């Protein structure tokens, strides 16, 4: 049943590259076969509940710009928001969604009331998932917006805050499991510090390690089959966050014995904030064996902060999905649009148009990545570049020779290597030919 919020807009369909309709897909065809699999099953698109339905259009210099009928801290408003959200998922044809607890329920007076509200909304979500076929990609807890978390959640100097956060995560894992969620995400927006003058860094890291171990223990206790994911980000809102980037997260997981239990959810905008490219973070996660899922968006490259815009750069998407395909594709993960409208984009159809453009961009990137993979366009030059390591001497260097023996080989064989071209310009041109 229509809520009326989207007027007479019909379900978005694939019309092909010649379509000029802003409410149709030009490149995203869910049933198109790419590398033997449906495009929908490769991309596994999800809509972010928070940016799409909870964000009000504010910024540090001004308040709300959007006028939505569900903007109040009442249970009835949360129920209306759920109706509109699932109508949107169905219109868009998105197979998944993601949410924080605070996105979907009113803020209660205490933990018990928060949990009761969350469970009431989960009752509604269960019915709507059954009616629409839309599934939950991942759930998470908002451990950063409420003022109780201003000094962190797991890393807070007050053990009562740690306990409240832990109980909240338990309720959110329960909700995620009940809804058939395929992952559970932890993002530490307040897990870090503003100044070392009032921070015991070592203690806070140990607290965070304990917190994550509790999450993993509870996952196994209740039989939750989903993947636990950490989402790296270097700063914002905190000056320095402990989950800075993929490399930092991996070091943290290794220290606390969790590298085989937890993977990463990588956001393009966060990679940029950390001084990396998106494909760098994806490639590193793949190399370290912790690749899990992605949040798709982009940042304004001039502003220097996290703008969470919809993706529109096809070459960037091609290189990102190339790494995803090299990792074997998504298993429990997917492509969550952690992207929001610009605060002047007020109309309901703007929300559809933003997602349509992002989905088309990702589809083009996926197809380009698949073609490069099939043709060996990047892998063949890479194999040639490292071919020497497949020879006898290269293998011995990695497996058996001591430093003395290597030195003897260099002297005996008069090894005097000459540099070879890295062919970067050629490879950049190759990528552009595919997009």
Swiss-Prot record:
Its EC number is 5.3.1.5. Its cofactor is Mg(2+). It comes from the Bacteria. It is found in: Cytoplasm. Binds 2 magnesium ions per subunit. Pfam families: AP_endonuc_2. GO terms for molecular function: magnesium ion binding; xylose isomerase activity. Mg(2+) 1 binds at residues 231, 267, 295, 338. InterPro entries: Xyl_isomerase-like_sf, Xyl_isomerase-like_TIM-brl, Xylose_isom_bac, Xylose_isomerase. The keyword Magnesium applies. SUPFAM superfamilies: Xylose isomerase-like. Keywords: Carbohydrate metabolism, Cytoplasm, Isomerase, Magnesium, Metal-binding, Xylose metabolism. Gene3D superfamilies: Divalent-metal-dependent TIM barrel enzymes. Mg(2+) 2 binds at residues 267, 270, 306, 308. GO terms for biological process: D-xylose metabolic process. It catalyses: alpha-D-xylose = alpha-D-xylulofuranose. NCBIfam families: PRK05474.1 (NF003998), xylose_isom_A (TIGR02630). Homotetramer. Belongs to the xylose isomerase family. This is Xylose isomerase. It comes from Brucella anthropi (strain ATCC 49188 / DSM 6882 / CCUG 24695 / JCM 21032 / LMG 3331 / NBRC 15819 / NCTC 12168 / Alc 37) (Ochrobactrum anthropi). The gene is xylA.
């Amino acid at each position: 049943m229509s809520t009326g919020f989207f007027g007479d807009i019909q379900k978005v369909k694939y019309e092909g590259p010649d379509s000029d309709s802003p409410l149709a897909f030009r490149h995203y065809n869910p049933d198109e076969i790419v590398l033997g699999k449906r495009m929908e099953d490769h991309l596994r698109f999800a809509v972010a509940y928070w940016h799409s339905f909870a964000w009000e259009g504010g910024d540090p210099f001004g308040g709300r710009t959007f006028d939505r009928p569900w903007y109040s801290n009442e249970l009835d408003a949360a129920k209306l928001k759920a109706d509109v959200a699932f109508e949107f998922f169905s219109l868009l044809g998105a197979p998944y969604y993601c949410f924080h607890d605070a996105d979907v329920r009113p803020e209660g007076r205490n933990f018990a009331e928060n949990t009761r509200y969350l469970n009431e909304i989960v009752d509604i979500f269960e019915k709507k998932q059954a009616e629409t076929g839309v599934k939950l990609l991942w759930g998470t807890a908002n451990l950063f917006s409420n003022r109780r978390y201003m000094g962190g959640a797991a890393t807070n100097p007050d053990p009562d805050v740690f306990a409240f956060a832990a109980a909240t995560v338990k309720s959110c894992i329960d909700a995620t499991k009940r809804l058939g969620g395929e992952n559970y995400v932890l993002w530490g927006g307040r897990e870090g510090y503003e100044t070392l003058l009032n921070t015991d860094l070592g203690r806070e890291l140990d607290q965070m390690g304990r917190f994550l171990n509790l999450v993993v223990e509870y996952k196994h206790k209740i039989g939750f089959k989903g993947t636990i994911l950490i989402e790296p980000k270097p700063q914002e809102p905190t000056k320095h966050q402990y989950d800075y980037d993929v490399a930092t997260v991996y070091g943290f997981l290794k220290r606390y014995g969790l590298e085989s239990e937890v993977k990463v959810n990588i956001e393009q905008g966060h990679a940029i904030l950390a001084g990396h490219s998106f494909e760098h973070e994806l490639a590193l996660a793949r190399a370290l064996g912790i690749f899990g899922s992605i949040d798709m968006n982009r940042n304004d490259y001039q502003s220097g902060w996290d703008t969470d815009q919809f993706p529109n750069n096809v070459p960037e998407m091609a290189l990102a999905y190339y790494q995803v395909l090299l990792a074997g594709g998504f298993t429990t993960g997917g492509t969550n649009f952690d992207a929001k409208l610009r605060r002047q984009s007020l109309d309901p159809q703007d929300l559809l148009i933003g997602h349509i453009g992002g989905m088309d961009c990702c589809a083009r990137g996926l197809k380009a990545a698949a073609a490069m993979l099939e043709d060996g366009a990047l892998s063949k030059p890479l194999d040639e570049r490292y071919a020497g390591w497949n020879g006898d001497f290269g293998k011995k260097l990695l497996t058996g020779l001591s430093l003395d023996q290597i030195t003897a080989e260099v002297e005996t064989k008069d090894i005097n290597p000459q540099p070879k071209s890295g062919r970067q310009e050629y490879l950049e041109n190759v990528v552009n030919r595919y997009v």
